[in-house]
């Protein structure tokens, strides 16, 4: 594992975060099985509403800096190739991996065509445990043992902000603030960029993370279903977090096939909505 301080610097200032305008595309909003679920004929799995069709949860963030755009991919699960083609993802300057569960990482090798565009290594940002797991899962990539593989560099992160730089535009960079929250017995990685934050696959949101989310305008947050789950937030728990941090709008992701979009969305409080695949969020450059 290597760290390139020019590409990914961990010396950024802590405290208030000023971010550029962002375009956030939710590539997938479904739980680990995706929706429709294989073999299921429930009302949601057979729904004609495209918002009920949910690929595995991931997102693509484009930061529009003065120097140029920076493209950050959040997770690359088994649907990543399909998602990237559907939503015209043509560049990835860094991959942020929330955790090592299969629905978030098994599309990692589909970054190859984007690497080959300029052959600059793609940083893979993850918590240390996740980075270790990724190395074990994809040794042929990270050990450089296969000549046709892309060059992906693991970057274990802690609590310090990091700067992600464009792989193609000189001087274009954005600060990313890591967020750590429990997903059952281990932690997952969330992030904040300026007025935007993303936190999926969490069973609770600790006080330290809530403090780091203060002033966020747009929050993408785990919300599996109305009923309790040991490692995911319920709709009510997610709404409580959104209210506590003062988010202007909160979009729930990682949603199961037990949730019909129209009916469930109507039950949520003001400012909290069910996300859906292909949703595009424009977040203005603000100081938080």
Features from the language model and the residues they span:
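Binuclear metal-dependent hydrolase catalytic cores
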Residues: 2-199, 265-287
């Amino acid at each position: 594992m290597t760290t390139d301080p020019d590409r990914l610097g961990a010396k950024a200032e802590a405290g208030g975060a000023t971010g550029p305008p962002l375009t956030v595309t939710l590539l997938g909003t479904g739980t680990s099985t995706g929706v429709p679920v294989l073999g299921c004929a429930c009302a949601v799995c057979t729904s004609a509403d495209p918002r009920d069709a949910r690929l595995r949860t991931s997102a693509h963030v484009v930061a529009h800096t003065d120097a140029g755009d920076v493209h950050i991919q959040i997770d690359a699960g088994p649907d990543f190739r399909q998602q990237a083609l559907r939503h015209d993802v043509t560049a990835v300057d860094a991959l942020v991996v929330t955790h090592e569960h299969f629905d978030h990482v098994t599309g990692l090798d589909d970054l190859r065509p984007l690497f080959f565009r300029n052959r600059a290594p793609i940083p893979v940002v993850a918590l240390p445990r996740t980075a270790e797991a990724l190395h074990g899962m994809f040794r042929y990539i990270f050990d450089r043992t296969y000549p046709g593989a892309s060059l992906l560099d693991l970057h274990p992160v802690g609590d310090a902000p990091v700067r992600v730089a464009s792989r193609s535009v000189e001087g274009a960079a954005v600060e990313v603030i890591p967020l750590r929250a429990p997903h059952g017995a281990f932690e997952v990685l969330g992030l904040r960029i300026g007025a935007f934050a993303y936190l999926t696959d969490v069973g609770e949101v600790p006080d330290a993370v809530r403090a780091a989310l203060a002033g966020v305008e747009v929050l993408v947050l785990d919300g599996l279903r109305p009923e309790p789950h040991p490692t995911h937030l319920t709709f009510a728990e997610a709404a409580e977090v959104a209210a506590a941090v003062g988010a202007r709008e909160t979009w729930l992701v990682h949603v199961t096939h037990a949730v019909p979009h129209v009916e469930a969305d109507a039950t949520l409080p003001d400012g909290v909505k069910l996300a859906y695949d292909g949703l595009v969020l424009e977040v203005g450059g603000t100081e938080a």
